[in-house]
Regions:
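Short, extreme N-terminal leader segments that mark the start of a protein/domain
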Residues: 1-65
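A contiguous, surface-oriented mixed alpha/beta subdomain in the mid-to-C-terminal portion of proteins
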Residues: 103-206
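Aromatic- and glycine-enriched beta-alpha-beta binding-site module
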Residues: 60-126
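Short, well-structured alpha-helical interface segments that form or flank functional binding sites
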Residues: 44, 86-89, 151, 189
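Short, basic/low-complexity N-terminal boundary segments at the transition from targeting/disordered tails
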Residues: 25-28, 69-79, 149-155
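Short, surface-exposed charged micro-motifs
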Residues: 48, 95-97, 193
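A short, compositionally biased
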Residues: 43-46, 92-93, 165-169
């Protein structure tokens, strides 16, 4: 989804603005998207939610948007997201994203370079006094909230794991064209074990 990320810099980007993101074509090749616990209620109405681990062995939740790499079945050729379907916060945060610094001690805000310009019609990143614009502060708030929610989601999944509620699942799907797809490395909640979970633990989940 991101092709030319630039870490936000007050000096380098002091005169830069951000062009309007008018459609979702940027996500047309997004096969799956991370979601936070706060999104589960809406997201599960439209997409299957799975749990997985990243390269650092950290848990995250994700929704499946396509059957193969480079495919998002919910975005049409004009970049319109399928009507009445929830759009994940990760997708809505574009063209901004939080990324790890090299030392991994702090997260920094980065932006898709293709959307940077100096046009009057675009939204300024910084005011004339060099302070963050209202537009940028709004984006930062959104990113920080999603990041905090993602950390909480990882803790939630770790709790499920400690109660032995997770099971690895190989997902086999046949689409309308009779094409077969198989996915592994995903985990789901074992419903039978969940039924026998103590009331206290169920309350803790909720």
């Amino acid at each position: 989804m991101y092709k030319k990320l630039e870490a936000l810099n007050k000096i380098q980007h002091k005169n830069k603005s951000v062009a309007e993101v008018s459609n979702f074509l940027y996500s047309k090749e997004l096969m799956n998207a991370p979601v936070a616990l706060s999104e589960f209620f809406e997201a599960c109405k439209n997409y299957p939610i799975f749990f997985a681990k990243d390269k650092d062995e950290k848990w995250f939740a994700t929704v499946l948007l396509g059957y193969k790499q480079g495919e998002n079945l919910f975005v049409d050729k004009k970049g319109v997201w399928k009507e009445l379907h929830y759009i994940p916060a990760f997708v809505r945060s574009y063209p901004f994203i939080l990324v790890n610094q090299e030392d991994k001690k702090e997260m920094v805000i980065a932006i898709e370079g293709e959307y940077l310009d100096e046009k009057e019609s675009s939204k300024k990143l910084f005011n004339e006094d060099g302070e963050n614009s209202e537009f940028l502060n709004s984006a930062i708030t959104f990113l920080n909230q999603f990041y905090a929610d993602s950390l909480g989601t990882a803790d939630f999944i770790k709790q499920l794991e400690s109660w032995e509620l997770l099971e690895e699942k190989i997902v086999n799907i046949v689409n309308t064209k009779e094409e077969k797809f198989s996915f592994n490395g995903f985990f789901i909640i074992n419903e039978e074990k969940l039924k026998h979970l103590s009331k206290k633990k169920k309350d803790d989940i909720c």
